[in-house]
């Protein structure tokens, strides 16, 4: 989730609390365990955001920006100096705890330190973090020249798997369809693949929302589950044309 810092920048002197938050952020770039600890700490840490310098609205309204992927996100920062670096003449800096920030804008997408190799928090991840402190682990792999995906002739998933994912996708109008196939087991443990038909601009959110919903359940059940996406405008990939592939959400795609 948290990307490597693309380059070092010089900032104004930070407070000890900001320095500690930055230290935790650097550790989070290297380890998922530290990433979980960082986000839990972030909830009670002081963070900074941008608001319009002139606004008569009774509640503080935060400024959003359009991410290169096409969605809008609320930027927030681990230090005042980083918030200043990204500000402009029409912007004022507001401070609050991470918890107050996330709770105060339900349904919003957030981006931490957007100018400094930060990360995106999608609405589903915000809900999970606020409710139980969970942070899903998502590793993006390119299939490339790896072995082709071969489906077993019949999938036997846990009873909870497809209903849980269907509930996620019902709140995501950009998800067109979803398919399930069972792959060759790994060390005796069942292995499944869920393929989501979704436009490229929403693919990452769909995968991360899915992972957030089922990662703990998969670990408790001792099964492996991978996620894949494909552009519905380009039709189903060849691996979804095999016997044993089950469409469990949305209409059949050509």
Predicted regions and their residues:
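An interfacial alpha-helical scaffold signature
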Residues: 2-254
